[in-house]
């Protein structure tokens, strides 16, 4: 029990401070622990992708995660995944979704993503965000059809919001996730992250991505509105927190210099108060 308690505390501490934590904390204990585990896994592989280790070291570390996931699904999990076994069994979490997340992180490691084609960006979003959603909706208890659809739309909405929020931070890592089609639309021919983020036409390049995010938010709202409120309480809170980020980005705009945007604690509390009591 002591080891299980320590693992729970570790998963919870990983989630603290994230925009998802407000939604996680509204879940019943068993569901909450499963979501903490999923989030902790995602953070660990994301930290590998974003580290300054040589590419070959990061690729090896991601491959080790694949091996450990395979071991988990053979019911012989390594120590760091031992407490995941109950969640995998209870909620039917799929091996391919865990592996898809690792594949998404590998896309960042193989080469710095710069001005990808929209289809490539969509694949990236599916792997690093919607695959997480496909695991999460099983924990929330949505039906298969609605769960897959919600994961598709909300995962992409959240990831596109991340991309728009983190333009400058990503450029510092040598990455540029704004798709080539959007850059072409704005007349930006360069794929150099630092040149693009300084270009006066950047707001025009960001506009289609923001519109796409809003479309996915609208689609996910429609799905959640058709489901019992108690089931979609957590994803609703997550969605509202991220939609607040997108709204702040749209108000601020994307012209340089860009001040970071943050949802205030007051706004977060208002969202939690409004949606945590959904029955």
Swiss-Prot record:
Domain of life: Bacteria
Keyword field: Plasmid, Transferase
UniProt cross-references to PROSITE patterns, sorted A to Z: SQUALEN_PHYTOEN_SYN_1, SQUALEN_PHYTOEN_SYN_2
GO biological process: carotenoid biosynthetic process
SUPFAM superfamilies from the UniProt entry: Terpenoid synthases (SSF48576)
InterPro entries in UniProt: Isoprenoid_synthase_dom_sf (IPR008949), SQ_synth_HpnD-like (IPR017828), Squ/phyt_synthse (IPR002060), Squalene/phytoene_synthase_CS (IPR019845), Trans_IPPS_bact-type (IPR044843), Trans_IPPS_HH (IPR033904)
Catalytic activity: 2 (2E,6E)-farnesyl diphosphate = presqualene diphosphate + diphosphate
Disulfide bond entries: none
An MF annotation (GO) of this entry: geranylgeranyl diphosphate synthase activity
Pathway: Secondary metabolite biosynthesis; hopanoid biosynthesis
Enzyme class: transferase
UniProt EC number: 2.5.1.103
Recorded family membership: Belongs to the phytoene/squalene synthase family. HpnD subfamily.
Chain's role: Involved in the biosynthesis of the hopanoid precursor squalene (SQ) from farnesyl diphosphate (FPP). Catalyzes the first step, the formation of presqualene diphosphate (PSPP) from two molecules of FPP.
PANTHER family: BIFUNCTIONAL LYCOPENE CYCLASE/PHYTOENE SYNTHASE (PTHR31480)
Protein name: Presqualene diphosphate synthase
């Amino acid at each position: 029990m002591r080891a299980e308690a320590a693992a729970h505390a570790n998963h919870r501490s990983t989630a603290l401070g994230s925009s998802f934590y407000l939604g996680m904390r509204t879940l019943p204990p068993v569901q909450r622990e499963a979501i903490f585990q999923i989030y902790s896994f995602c953070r660990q592989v994301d930290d590998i992708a974003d580290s300054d280790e040589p590419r070959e070291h990061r690729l090896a570390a991601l491959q080790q995660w694949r091996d450990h996931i395979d071991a988990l699904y053979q019911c012989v999990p390594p120590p760091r995944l031992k407490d995941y076994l109950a969640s995998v069994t209870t909620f039917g979490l799929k091996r391919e979704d865990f592996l898809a997340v690792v594949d998404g992180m590998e896309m960042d490691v193989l080469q710095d993503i710069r001005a990808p084609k929209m289809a490539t960006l969509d694949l990236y979003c599916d792997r690093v965000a919607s695959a997480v959603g496909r695991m999460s909706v099983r924990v929330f208890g949505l039906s298969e059809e609605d769960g897959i659809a919600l994961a598709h739309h909300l995962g992409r909405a959240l990831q596109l919001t991340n991309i728009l929020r983190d333009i400058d931070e990503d450029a510092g890592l040598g990455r540029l996730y704004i798709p080539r089609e959007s850059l072409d639309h704005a007349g930006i021919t360069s794929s150099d992250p630092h040149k693009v983020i300084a270009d006066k036409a950047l707001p025009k390049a960001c506009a289609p991505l923001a519109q796409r995010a809003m479309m996915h938010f609208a689609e996910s709202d429609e799905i959640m509105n058709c489901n019992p409120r108690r089931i979609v309480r957590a994803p609703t809170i997550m969605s509202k927190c991220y939609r607040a980020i997108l709204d702040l980005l749209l108000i601020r705009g994307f012209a340089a210099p860009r001040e970071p945007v943050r949802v205030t604690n007051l706004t977060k509390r208002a969202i939690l108060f409004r949606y945590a009591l959904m029955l």
